[in-house]
Amino acid sequence: MNLLRYTSKSIQKAIEHRIEHRPDRENLHWNPELVSESPAPDEKALSSSSAARSNPYVARAPTETSDASLKETMESVKGVLGRWGRRVGEAAMKAESLAGNTWQHPLRAAMGRIAQSTKVLAEGGYEKIFRQTFETVPEEQLQNSFACYLSTSAGPVMGVLYVSTAKLAYCSDTSLVVIPLHQLKSVNPSISTVNPAEKYIQVISVDDHEFWFMGFLNYEGAVTSLQDTLQAGASVCVI
């Protein structure tokens, strides 16, 4: 409990410090797609209607289940983390009000990432969630995980992109995406010519299904990881 208090205070101070002292805050612009509820561009959208149902890599996220004791423990942890998240959120929103509209979008996106990290911590970490959510084989290893957004026709959806030795897998509260490595065709970084701050990663399967991911905290690291995974999958197919 002391560790949680210490962590919350440290993160809160760090957020307030960065907001107050960031030199380029007046020139910072955030992609509206990441924080608005308007539909994403059609060419970067995963349809949520008939097209999504026909996509073999997409499924609805299952309802979470757990035994009584684990659920009780997790609910207790979530309660503590939830209160912490609200305190951080209140502090950030106050700072946002002082900083002006320019900081509105990045702050909300940052709060979204904090909420996602809080949820992951409360549920036992990325490795545990990955193995509970997706079917895995004994020798499969989780190599990387990235909090990001998946572009859909209903708007960007926040979740986690998992990179393992066998698949790419994306998990949100509403959707699951699973692409075996041997089904990967290409991984393409894409940067908006109008606003270079808008960066995407396009993933294409061998049967030409497209997925657009955005809002990475470490964009370059995500691109490198996904491209390395694509090459590894190609090597396995050749062998």
UniProtKB/Swiss-Prot annotation:
Which N-terminal stretch is annotated as signal sequence?
none
From the UniProt entry, list the residue stretches annotated as the region Disordered: 29-68
Residue ranges of the GRAM domain? 128-191
Q: What InterPro entries does the record tag this protein with? A: GEM-like, GRAM, PH-like_dom_sf
Superkingdom? Eukaryota
Family (UniProt)? Belongs to the GEM family.
Name of this chain's protein: Putative GEM-like protein 3
Organism equals Arabidopsis thaliana
